């Protein structure tokens, strides 16, 4: 947004509160370029991070975001470390948005944030019944050949990122290099962490993308990594 956003739109600006969120209705030529579910922000003395809820010609409605960088809003013990991660968590935790794509370099937290959001909405809010994780099984380098076992066991070599992120989400914050830990990691010591990991694994199914054709998923949180 332009630095003088509030001054520029002050004449026709409407605002109201609903469910701890602040909403703004703005009018002007800028609105024509805004798209629904697009994020807008401005820094400075009056910082603003918002999501475009309605875009109709020269009118738009903005909804302020939940600040997931604050510990009180942590998602399964994970907090946003920058503006982009806060945007991602607002998308992943929004019940009105059914399809989210995240693009970023390796190590920017895409899988971690997605998995934390999935666990919260499956084990805490009960919005979903289980989590399904899949990815394309394309090897880097030489193929390791045919693998024995079930479909899930065959997928194990491609699920290293999942295991790494589950370790972070089930580790107390004081033991984590990032200073962040899982929601239930601090309850019950080692026994509690083991029980939590068992509970998590019971709700996570690993599937191969090669066998997805024709499937219909009801009440599932689907992650394509």
PLM segments and residue spans:
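Conserved catalytic network of the ASCE P-loop NTPase/AAA+ motor domain
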Residues: 94, 123-126, 213-217
